[in-house]
């Protein structure tokens, strides 16, 4: 089996780019869809697919104004504390819109819907449809069912709730993804089987299920044909990917990366989110063998204390994490590293926190998603005694964020005079002679250039540091089109 099996015929060059921008309209005759997305990149991806789905099936176009929408969808996240109350608070505002327009359709999806489906019906009976992350592909059918029973007496109406966990069938029913720009996200697996003591994901998205290899490669090849040059592979535990091959075998995540790198047009590869347990030597080797792999890694660790990691049921030690990063930086010395940190986990002592702070300083993280611990109902950690005062947790969090911010500033400053590989994404909104792109490390890079170069990779020498995430540069070399 080779990757050519999955490449569509007639792949287009970047100059024949067929990028489609999202449609927004003020035409009152067109049916309009508003989606509020909360939480992670998986939810962002799912929301895009909902828009694709309802656009293809029922002709809905996106609007950024909920007041003019015919359908309001909320794609919810349950990671943080009070997530449920945030949902009901927003639904209260939507209720007023429905009182003004009884034909308005309201749907709630995502992880809070999985957890709180029955409760949503009780507390917000004006919600018409409730669906989970694994059943969003059934939205067109649910919408048809809703319209079919609008005139029925209340007691005859069927409750439109589908928060089941079917096999990973939703991708079989989703339309071809629309392309917006030169980057795209591709979901390769759903759920997580790690059962960390603090996490709700296994309960809201189910256990790990991988998409078949041929489906993933075909989707990416199709995106490349439409001009996409950077792919971000998505999953709750993306490096745990075990996709079935056409021949009936199993493809691992490192093997998938090698196959994706063969697809004409794909010049850059990212992925999120990964787990240290499955950050294997085979995966690290990909960074040496595949130039498409960016020198940026998001690898959640959650804490720098072995005691806390044990209580979290992360099943690895700090030394294991440090060893993996050392191997990676031996191959890529310029590797930028980001992570997740939970501060104030039950039982975290002053000594535990000091270990975490020193760990962060030693590894030089570039960015983090760091939060004070939130008790999530139904998780093992919710039963642990939590004696740390809230103000202490917040003080610790502020220290972590300050250390990481300083590290990020230093890493941005270190870019001065260096040559960065940049994907040129657009012409500046402020100046038609300025181009805007993204470096491997996610910094925005601006420089003087012609609009015809948009969609290409270029070598840019960094000449000025403007802000933490914005640098100026000078074009040195324009790479040949990768298609």
UniProtKB/Swiss-Prot annotation:
InterPro entries: Elp3/MiaA/NifB-like_rSAM, Methylthiotransferase, Methylthiotransferase_CS, Methylthiotransferase_N, Methylthiotransferase_N_sf, MiaB_methiolase, rSAM, rSAM_horseshoe. Its main location: cytoplasm. Pfam families: Radical_SAM, TRAM, UPF0004. It is found in: Cytoplasm. Its cofactor is [4Fe-4S] cluster. SUPFAM superfamilies: Radical SAM enzymes (SSF102114). This is tRNA-2-methylthio-N(6)-dimethylallyladenosine synthase. Belongs to the methylthiotransferase family. MiaB subfamily.
């Amino acid at each position: 089996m080779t990757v050519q099996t999955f490449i569509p015929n007639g792949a287009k060059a970047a100059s024949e780019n067929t990028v489609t921008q999202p449609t927004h309209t003020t035409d009152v005759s067109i049916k309009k869809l508003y989606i509020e997305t909360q939480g992670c990149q998986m939810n962002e991806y799912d929301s895009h697919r909902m828009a694709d789905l309802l656009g293809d099936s029922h002709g809905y176009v996106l609007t950024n104004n909920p007041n003019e929408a015919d359908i309001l969808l909320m794609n919810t996240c349950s990671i943080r504390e009070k997530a449920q109350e945030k949902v009901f608070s927003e639904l209260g505002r939507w209720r007023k819109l429905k009182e003004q327009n009884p034909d308005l359709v309201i749907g709630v999806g995502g992880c809070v819907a999985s957890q709180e489906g029955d409760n949503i019906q009780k507390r917000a009976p004006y919600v018409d449809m409730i669906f989970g992350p694994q059943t969003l592909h059934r939205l067109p059918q649910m919408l048809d069912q809703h319209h079919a029973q609008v005139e029925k007496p209340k007691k005859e109406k069927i409750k439109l709730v589908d928060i089941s966990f079917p096999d990973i069938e939703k991708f079989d029913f989703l339309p071809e993804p629309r392309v917006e720009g030169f980057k795209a996200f591709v979901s390769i697996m759903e759920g997580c089987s790690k059962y960390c003591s603090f996490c709700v994901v296994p309960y809201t998205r189910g256990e790990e299920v991988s998409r078949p290899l041929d489906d993933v490669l075909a989707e990416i090849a199709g995106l490349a044909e439409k001009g996409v040059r950077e792919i971000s592979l998505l999953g709750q535990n993306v490096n745990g990917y075990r996709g079935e091959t056409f021949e009936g075998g199993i493809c691992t995540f490192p093997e998938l990366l090698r196959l994706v790198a063969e697809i004409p047009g794909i010049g850059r590869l990212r992925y999120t989110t990964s787990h240290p347990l499955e950050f294997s030597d085979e995966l690290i080797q990909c960074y040496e063998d595949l130039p498409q792999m960016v020198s940026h890694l998001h690898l959640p660790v959650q804490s720098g204390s072995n005691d806390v990691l044990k209580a979290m049921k992360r099943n690895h030690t700090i030394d294991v994490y440090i060893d993996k990063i050392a191997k990676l930086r031996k191959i890529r010395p310029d590797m930028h590293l980001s992570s997740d940190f939970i501060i104030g986990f039950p039982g975290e002592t002053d000594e535990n926190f000091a270990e975490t702070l020193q760990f962060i300083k030693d590894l030089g993280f570039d960015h983090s998603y760091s939060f004070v611990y939130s008790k999530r109902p139904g998780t093992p950690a919710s039963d642990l005694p939590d004696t740390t005062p809230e103000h202490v947790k917040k003080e610790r969090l502020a220290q972590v964020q300050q250390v990481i911010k300083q590290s990020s500033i230093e890493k941005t400053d270190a870019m001065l005079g260096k040559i960065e590989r940049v994907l040129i994404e657009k012409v500046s909104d402020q100046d038609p002679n300025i181009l805007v792109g993204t470096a491997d490390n996610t910094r925005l890079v601006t420089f003087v250039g012609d609009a015809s170069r948009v969609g290409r990779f270029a070598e840019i020498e960094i000449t000025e540091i403007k802000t933490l995430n914005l640098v100026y540069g000078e074009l040195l070399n324009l790479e040949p089109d990768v298609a």
